[in-house]
């Protein structure tokens, strides 16, 4: 995860990770088998995420098929929502939906740069969104 320019997105991603950990702990404590995938598949998804961000297609590892990143992320959010509610972080998790809908800081920075090819404007955008 890259650094987010909006605090609420950072909190949302923290809530997502927290809920995922809760889910994994419960599976482990129940004696259920945890998923295991080849490193090559995990590395490919990391590369695709770094290269294409939310606009890419990741490999849905259990199904071994490519799906839009946003769609896969929404499925994960839906899957762990109950855990976030148990933890009291469901409101923060809503920010992940906002991030998926409106895009992340990197996407906004690209739009700003392509509009005027001025890195100062990109920095201005980051400062405005970070301090908002």
Where are these regions (language model features)?
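C-terminal accessory/tail domains of diverse enzymes
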Residues: 1-132
């Amino acid at each position: 995860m890259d650094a987010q320019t909006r605090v609420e997105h950072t909190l949302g991603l923290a809530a997502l990770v927290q809920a995922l950990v809760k889910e994994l702990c419960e599976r482990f404590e129940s004696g259920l088998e945890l998923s295991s995938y080849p490193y090559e598949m995990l590395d490919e998804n990391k590369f695709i995420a770094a290269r294409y961000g939310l606009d890419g297609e990741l490999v849905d590892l259990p199904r071994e098929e490519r799906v839009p990143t946003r769609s896969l992320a929404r499925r994960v959010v839906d899957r762990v929502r109950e855990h976030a509610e148990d933890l009291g972080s469901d409101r923060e998790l809503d920010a992940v939906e906002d991030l998926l809908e409106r895009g992340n800081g990197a996407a906004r920075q690209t739009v700003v740069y392509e509009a005027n090819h001025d890195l100062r404007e990109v920095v201005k955008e980051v400062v405005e969104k970070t301090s908002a």
